[in-house]
């Protein structure tokens, strides 16, 4: 039984045991493109990946399943070397603690996503990045593009082109790196981890 066959079983909920960690060769491989029209198996896998992210962000389900909260997941992280990523970025509460009008600023499963253009300006998160596949803290600015245009297909086999900036752009670039065999710390300057080149945007 393949990893995907196990993951898409009706009763299976993806948990931390399904997520492979650094050192596993799948994380360093360039993942294969999915074929269209999408197979039921690939559609279900995408739905299971999104379900994991929702569970991970839910305090009750997250604790019950022992999950680390995540905003993105790539198929290679669950040992499936395919170009599928799921992104779930919640909107924050307002200054008075009221819930946002829209729960998520991005909620999408992207098949065969690719960056087709990007800004000259770089950006990095002030607090650095983490990863569900990396069980240690690696400090430093993860240098990425401040703005990207991404093409992808959805589960209905429809093609989309979206422009992203800020945190959403960072998250999508992190996940696209996974399908290209790249981990976030590859983008940290080893000699000077907190080097901020002129014009680089630091996102809080």
UniProtKB/Swiss-Prot annotation:
Catalytic activity, as annotated: N-terminal N-formyl-L-methionyl-[peptide] + H2O = N-terminal L-methionyl-[peptide] + formate
Disulfide bonds listed in the record: none
Positions of Fe cation binding: 131, 174, 178
Cofactor(s) the protein requires to work: Fe(2+)
Keywords: Hydrolase, Iron, Metal-binding, Protein biosynthesis
Enzyme Commission no: 3.5.1.88
Keyword check for Protein transport: no
Enzyme class: hydrolase
Record SUPFAM superfamilies: Peptide deformylase
Pfam families named in the record: Pep_deformylase (PF01327)
Molecular function GO terms recorded: metal ion binding; peptide deformylase activity
Gene3D superfamilies reported for this sequence: Peptide deformylase
Active site annotation, chain numbering: 175
GO biological process, one term: co-translational protein modification
Cofactor binding note from Swiss-Prot or TrEMBL: Binds 1 Fe(2+) ion.
Protein family membership: Belongs to the polypeptide deformylase family.
PANTHER family in UniProt: PEPTIDE DEFORMYLASE, PEPTIDE DEFORMYLASE 2
Function: Removes the formyl group from the N-terminal Met of newly synthesized proteins. Requires at least a dipeptide for an efficient rate of reaction. N-terminal L-methionine is a prerequisite for activity but the enzyme has broad specificity at other positions.
Protein name: Peptide deformylase
Taxonomic source organism: Streptococcus equi subsp. equi (strain 4047)
Gene: def
């Amino acid at each position: 039984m393949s990893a995907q066959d196990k993951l898409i079983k009706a009763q299976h909920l993806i948990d931390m045991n399904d997520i492979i960690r650094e050192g596993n060769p799948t994380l360093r491989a360039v993942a294969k493109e999915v074929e269209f029209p999408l197979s039921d198996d690939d559609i279900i896998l995408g739905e299971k990946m999104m379900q994991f992210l929702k569970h991970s962000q839910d305090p009750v389900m997250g604790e019950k399943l022992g999950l680390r909260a995540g905003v993105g997941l790539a198929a290679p992280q669950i040992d499936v070397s395919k170009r599928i990523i799921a992104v779930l970025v919640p909107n924050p509460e307002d200054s008075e603690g009221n819930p946002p009008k829209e729960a998520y600023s991005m909620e999408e499963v992207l098949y065969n996503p690719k960056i087709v253009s990007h800004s000259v300006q770089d950006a990095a998160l002030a607090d650095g990045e983490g990863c569900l596949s990396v069980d240690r803290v690696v400090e430093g600015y993860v240098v990425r593009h401040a703005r990207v245009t991404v093409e992808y297909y959805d589960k209905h086999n429809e093609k989309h082109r979206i422009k992203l900036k800020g945190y959403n752009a960072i998250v999508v670039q992190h996940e696209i790196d996974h399908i290209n065999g790249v981990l976030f710390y590859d983008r940290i300057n080893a000699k000077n981890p907190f080097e901020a080149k002129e014009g680089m945007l630091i996102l809080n």
